[in-house]
Design a protein with these regions (language model features):
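Conserved glycine-rich Rossmann-like NAD(P)H-binding loop of the short-chain dehydrogenase/reductase
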Residues: 31-47
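Substrate-binding pocket helix/loop in short-chain dehydrogenase/reductase
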Residues: 99-100, 104-112
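Active-site helix of classical SDR
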Residues: 123, 159
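Alpha-helical segment proximal to the catalytic Tyr-Lys
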Residues: 128, 172-175
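Residue(s) in the substrate-gating loop at a strand-loop-helix junction
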Residues: 143
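SDR active-site lid
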Residues: 176-249
Length: 281
């Protein structure tokens, strides 16, 4: 068997240098899979390679907004796996927060490019490998903000709605190729995006790791969850036909309630979220 994979199952992960992607890479490695880890964070990738062992992974810088980067990454991955891909985890994402008009237009467009257009690109580029692999799966990171449009992260939330809709459509389309498609809708996950997402309206100072863990909710559907909880969800998804995965599972109730009582959900969002920013014009 050609390449480093040597017949092992293989997963291609974007946003693999940190957070949910890194946790997933480590879990699948522990399960005996060959891991393709891709990110713009080269230092993070190099430290991941040291953890996994170079014989067990392929690391490569990948700008998900550049289709040629994706094509080159897919070709390099195929060389190591004999043209197979058991699972695509299209996970890279960024955020912007603040009132809609405070977020620079260019920054909003970049959120769309990274969070949605790059997912589309990943699927176009990965599909030939997925089709060539029995029981293959494309798994995509959506968000709890795809259950209802969320104020102050409006464009981010819209991209995650788009991901959810794409997942639903392609889960039907790709079935004719024997390829499954599903997504994960994480809530509050302990990753760098919580600390690094700019607040363009300026009323939320940056928080440290310690402050985040002290002040974040400890219970309820929006309690702070470790990145490993999403990795475990990705692992469970590979052996399942479930379409949407919620982390924690209670977030799924928002989807249920939105269908049954959309006005109630909207009223609750206005009541609970907007007062948090009442001092901001």
């Amino acid at each position: 068997m050609s390449g480093k994979a040597k017949g092992r199952k293989s997963i291609f992960i974007t946003g693999a240098a940190s957070g949910m992607g890194r946790a997933t890479a480590k879990l699948f490695h522990d399960k005996g899979w060959f891991v393709g880890a891709f990110d713009v964070n080269e230092a993070g990738l190099q430290s991941l390679e040291q953890e996994l062992g170079s014989e067990n992974c392929l690391i490569r810088r990948l700008d998900v907004t550049a289709k040629p980067d994706f094509e080159a990454a897919m070709a390099a991955f195929a060389d190591e796996t004999g043209g197979k891909m058991d699972m695509l985890f299209s996970n890279a994402g960024i955020g912007e927060s603040g009132w809609f008009e405070d977020i620079p237009y260019e920054a909003a467009l970049r959120v769309i490019q990274v969070n949605f257009v790059a997912v589309v690109t990943s699927l176009y580029c990965a599909l030939p490998l997925l089709k060539a692999t029995p029981n293959a799966m494309a798994f995509i990171t959506s968000s709890s903000s795809a259950t209802y449009g969320m104020p102050r992260i409006a464009v981010y939330s819209a991209t995650k709605h788009a991901v959810k809709g794409l997942t639903e459509a392609l889960s039907v389309e790709f079935a004719r190729h024997g390829v499954r498609v599903a997504d994960v809708l994480p809530g509050l996950i302990d990753t760098a995006i919580l600390r690094t997402t700019p607040d363009r309206s300026g009323n939320r100072p940056p928080v440290s790791d310690a402050e985040l863990r002290v002040n974040a909710p400890k219970k309820g559907m929006f309690r702070l969850m470790p990145a490993s909880s999403v990795a475990e969800c990705v692992w469970a998804a590979y052996g399942s036909d479930r379409l949407h995965w919620y982390v924690p599972s209670e977030i799924g109730w928002i989807d249920v309630m939105k269908a049954l009582a959309p006005k109630f959900i909207r009223a609750q969002i206005k009541k609970r979220l907007l007062p948090l920013f009442a001092a901001q014009p």
